[in-house]
């Protein structure tokens, strides 16, 4: 659905290039889902391998939401916005099929007691989102969309392993990946 929405909103004005970007996004989402289903149990559960498809959809649709909220309708007639939509669509699509680690939040435990500061932070986050939801949420989507590359670069600079795939339960450097 995100590829169809962004195509109708802006990419169709770019002709075959816009169609190709939407197709790449759809194909990448299908490959991402297939890889997610086959890698269960061999990938570190704290991270996703590549951007998860809901996050990619949020990134693409978040851009459409922000631009629509700003009053831009039928932007396939505005080349700069159409090309920006193309870049975001391709980025989201291709990032879904990379091996870049994206934090999954699966190790967050909401059943144990939560410190008071966390409750205050959640209330503050809700207040900030209510200031102007489209811009704040799109900014959060962008931060998450870039976070995987930041983690990848940091791990690579520190000399840590960047692959999330465990090939053996017996190798010491893969300890903890099969939880």
Residue locations for each model-derived region?
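Multi-pass membrane catalytic core of lipid/isoprenoid biosynthesis enzymes
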Residues: 1-33
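Generic hydrophobic-segment detector
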Residues: 12, 19, 40, 82-83, ...
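C-terminal membrane-associated helical module and adjoining short loops/tails
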Residues: 45-179
């Amino acid at each position: 659905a995100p590829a169809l929405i962004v195509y109708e909103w802006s990419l169709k004005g770019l002709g075959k290039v816009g169609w190709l970007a939407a197709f790449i996004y759809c194909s990448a989402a299908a490959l991402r889902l297939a890889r997610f289903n086959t890698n269960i149990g061999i990938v570190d559960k704290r991270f996703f391998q590549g951007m998860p498809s809901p996050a990619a959809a949020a990134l693409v649709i978040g851009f459409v939401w922000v631009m629509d909220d700003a009053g831009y309708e039928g932007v396939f007639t505005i080349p700069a916005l159409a090309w920006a939509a193309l870049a975001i669509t391709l980025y989201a699509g291709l990032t879904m099929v990379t091996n870049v680690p994206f934090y999954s939040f699966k190790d967050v435990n909401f059943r144990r007691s939560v410190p008071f500061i966390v409750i205050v932070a959640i209330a503050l986050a809700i207040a900030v989102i209510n200031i102007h939801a489209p811009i704040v949420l799109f900014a959060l989507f962008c931060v998450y969309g870039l976070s995987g590359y930041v983690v990848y670069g940091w791990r690579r600079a520190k000399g840590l392993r960047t692959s999330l795939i465990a090939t053996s339960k017996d190798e010491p450097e893969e300890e903890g990946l099969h939880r």
